[in-house]
Every structure is written in structure tokens, then in C-alpha cells.
Amino acid sequence: MLIQIADLFTPAEAAQIRARLEAADWVDGKVTAGYQSAQVKHNRQLSEQHPLAQELGGLILQRLAANNLFMSAALPRKIFPPLFNRYEGGEAFGYHVDNALRPVPGTAERVRTDLSATLFFSEPDSYDGGELVVDDTYGPRTVKLPAGHMVLYPGTSLHKVTPVTRGARISAFFWLQSLVREDSQRSLLLEMDVAIQRLNQDTPGHASIVQLTGVYHNLLRRWTDV
């Protein structure tokens, strides 16, 4: 399941965030990579302890909590604090799979990376390359979204970022642990949730809506991992 979430931030908001990030101090992106990933990771990141990273990360979490599509698709239990990266001058991140577990800095918490997310802050016409390529059962899927838009995809996916040959690609990225760890089960629940919402719009008050909602919650009860 690969889900695009539009307009988490407006273009104007994304531009303001991008301007603040462009002026920040960046460090080698290998600091958050595992051993294998570090071999193919060539980018820069904002330090996890940087005040700007913490401020913007908190703002992203607020927007996510208010986004119905995100909440329905992800069914989040834990969200790793968002990180920020920058690619330019040929920088890229070769094919890799994200670490299964991420310790949350400064806590005893660990987040199982059921889902990965990239939130774009650079407009796609402002840089060449920098596509996120996610391999799934249907083959490679290429993602390059407008500023303020986000993509959500399974943490089990093999993926890469192609070299940025012009301009700079600035984005946020993070992982989350879902209440439902299996991607196929989350996909079914999302389809059912969307169908129930459409039925509510088309035939409000229909008795079948209550029955279908009960089926949704019984499946969620069966599959939830808390």
C-alpha cells in the first residue's frame, strides 16, 4: 500500500518551512543509518537535537493527528519524531530497507517501522532527480510530490532516492508503528473505512452502514496489536 496525502501543508507554509531549513546547519546523513544503509547513503540531515527539527517535528505531528486519511491509512500507535534531510550536488540514497526497530532518542521507547513516510518541502520543478523509488509487488513506483504533500509506504519496502543533479531536495521523513502491523490487513481496513464514509454520504442513515461499521471494528479488534 502506497498512499499519497495531499496538502498536509499549504504551498505557502511549505515555502516558509523550506526557507528556515535552508538556513539551518546540516550534518552527514549517515548518523541515522544502519550499517548496510550507510554504504549507500549520501545526503545531509538536520541533527535530531536541533531546536528547529524539534519545533517542525511537533508541527508535523499536529497536522498528522488532524488528517483523516493519515489516521485511517496508518492507524498509528507510535510515531518516530520526524527527521529532516537534504540532497543536492549528486547526493543520493541507494536501494535499502529501513531498520525494523528505531530507538527513540532520550527514551527507552522503540518504534517498529511498519510504515515509512516522506513529506516533501521542495517543489518538484526546483530540482532534477531526487525521486523516491519504492519497489512493491507491481514493480518500482516513482514518487516526486509537490511541496507540502506526503507519501506513506510499507517499512518492508526496498526503496531508494535517485541522485539530485540540480537544485536541492528538502524533506521530512519518519517511521511509525501501526496498531495493525500487516500491510494487507491495513489496506483492507482502509478500503472498508472509505466505503463506509461514501455510503454515509450517498445514503445517510442506511441500516447497512451500522452493520458494516460493526464488521470494521470487529476486524480491527481481531488484528490490533496493542
UniProtKB/Swiss-Prot annotation:
Gene3D superfamilies: q2cbj1_9rhob like domain, Rabenosyn, Rab binding domain. GO terms for biological process: DNA damage response; intracellular iron ion homeostasis. 2-oxoglutarate binds at residue 169. Its cofactor is Fe(2+); L-ascorbate. InterPro entries: Oxoglu/Fe-dep_dioxygenase_dom, PKHD_C, PKHD_hydroxylase, Pro_4_hyd_alph, Pro_4_hyd_alph_FE2OG_OXY. The keyword Metal-binding applies. This is PKHD-type hydroxylase BP3529. It comes from Bordetella pertussis (strain Tohama I / ATCC BAA-589 / NCTC 13251).
